[in-house]
Amino acid sequence: MARYQPVHGATFLTLLQMRQTLLFLPCFLICLFARAADTPPNIVMIISDDHLWSDYGFMGHPHIKTPSLDKLAGESLTFRRGYVPSSLCCPSLASIITGLYPHQHRVTSNDPPIPAGMKPGAFHSSPLFEEGREVMSKHLESAGTLPQRLSAKGYLSLQTGKWWLKHFSRGGFTHGMTKGGRHGDSGLDIGRKTMQPIYDFIGEATQQQKPFLVWYAPMMPHDPHTPPKRLLDKYIDKAPSLPVAKYWAMVEWFDETCGALLKHLDEKGLRENTIVVYVSDNGWITNPKTGRYAEKSKQSQYDGGLRSPIMLRWPAKVQPRMSDELATSLDFAPTLLKAAGLEPTKEMPGLNLLDGTAISARKTIYGECFTHNFVDLNVPASSLKWRWMVDGYTKLIVPNKANQPDDSVELYDLKADPSEEKNLAADQAAKVTEMTAKLDAWWKP
């Protein structure tokens, strides 16, 4: 009997330990799942540059091939009627990263005001140019940015590509490529020459077990339109001119880089809890003769400059679907902050794209277009060219007579006239009055 005592004693201790373990296990699992649920998602922001809203396979272009973006659209909550508030690079990008209208963040234009009598080339190399850019950068810092706000949740953030406002750190990024050049300096290598800085950053953030934000804003398909010959050859016989073929090939080249980035996320096992958002900073229509932008595109008050598909992919949380509801790039900041467990600021006018009720209830969006160079760095209204709004499928454009003295009010039915050819303002005066009252209630400078 005695020789079995140690065995009985060990069995008793084992059962006691098992009982304690079983009692502890639910608490452990609850904590584990709570921690997993509290893990903020990674964020990848893909922002194309000078890209017309219809120039994608999934948006119906008959020739341009965009298989990676088509796939992303099919995996995302995709808004076919997305807009940016301004059709110019710098203010549009500033709105994406702040969640504010240009008149709110005050970065309304690409460059500081040119002194009377000074040529642009001389101005860009003068101390006045850098002094003006410093004011612009301070405006952005005062407004607050997405990377700054996400740092409260421990995010590491990387800037690549287009960046107008001096050193990347001025935007709150912890990592970056742009050191202060006008619109990106070495950051402009991303996409065209390399994707490695993004891959290295993702590896570093993953190793540190930190959530991350990637700002992928390559200068693509923006000119210079220098696509690889293998892509250009695909479009030479399909496009109406060589400049158009070059632009089409640039779009496919950009699409390839997006595919490489998304593939990298998959290979690293980051797909499920990484939010990928997409928008273009503004539109573009190629002048078939010159290769520059045509009317009604970049820098204009028309959909050719303002409209862009907007996508949000989050496999762990979001069911893919195509939507014809209105969306705006101003929605990114509140959406991503909420996803990270943070509250949007009261100044942010955008909606959470994941709040289906709010998105369905919204019928109107607003925007504003400004001069390429500031008129006054501290007075947004001084640089204003047009205010605009879309109410359902009706679009109103109101010029600022101080800068556009020859322009008239414009009203379009976007469903019947998506290229905005027939101005209905003279025939629908009551509608113009009704919508102008809404526009003035939004912002009347």
Please tell me what each predicted stretch does.
Residues 43-44, 49, 150, 162, ...:
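A short aromatic-rich beta-strand->coil structural motif
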Residues 64, 264-321, 328:
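Histidine-centered active-site microenvironments of extracellular/periplasmic hydrolases
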Residues 195-202, 233-274, 339, 441:
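A long, amphipathic alpha-helix that forms part
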Residues 284-290, 296-297, 318, 330-333, ...:
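C-terminal cap/loop subdomain of S1 sulfatases and analogous C-terminal strand-loop tails that border
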